[in-house]
Amino acid sequence: MCSSDLLMETLNVSSLWGLPVVFVCENNGFSEFTPAAEVTAGRIADRARAFSVPAVEVDGNDVTEVWRAAGEAIARARDGGGPSFIEARTYRIQGHFEAESFVLGNGRYRDNEEIEAWRQQDPIALFRDRLVSSGTAGAVDLDRIEAGVLDRVADAAAYAEAGQPADPELAETLMFAPEPAGSRQQESEA
C-alpha cells in the first residue's frame, strides 16, 4: 500500500492542511509474493518527504528505535507540527494469507533459511533479552507478565467461543447513523 494513490493523496492533504497524523508504514519487504524492490521504485520514506512530511526510516524489529520515532512523531502532531511518516523496516514471517501454500503449491517465493534468519530477529524476544541483560527487568517477572497475558487471551477466546451466534436480523442495525426525524418526509415532498 505504500505505493498506492490513496497514500499519495492522503500525504498531500495532511501536509497541505497540517493535520496531526502519524503514518506508520510496516515495510515487510514484499508486495504480496513479490519482493518490494521489484515493484517499488526508490525509497518509501521519500514519498512522504516529497509532500514535505517529515519522515524517518527505522529498524522495525528494534522496539526502542520504533518507540523513539513514534514519540517524536506524536509530539510533533500534538504540538501542531503536522504529519509525520515512519517507515519501519521488518520482515513478514508468516505468509501473505492463510491459504498461501495451497495457492502457490511448491512455488515458494522465499526459502526457509531466509525465514528462519528473520525469525531469530523477533522484536519481542530481542527486547526481552535487552531488558533482562540490562537489569531493567527480571526474567521471572517477564515470565509472570507473559503468563498473565496468555491467560487473558485464553479467557477472551473461551468467552467468545461460548457466546451465542449473532442474530442475522441485527446485521445491519449498527451500520448507519439513525436518520434525522422527518428526513424521509422531506425527500418525498421534494
Task: Identify the function of each model-found stretch.
Residues S4-D155, Y159-A162:
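Glycine-rich ThDP/TPP pyrophosphate-binding loop and its adjacent helix/strand module
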Residues D155-A190:
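C-terminal intrinsically disordered, low-complexity extensions immediately downstream
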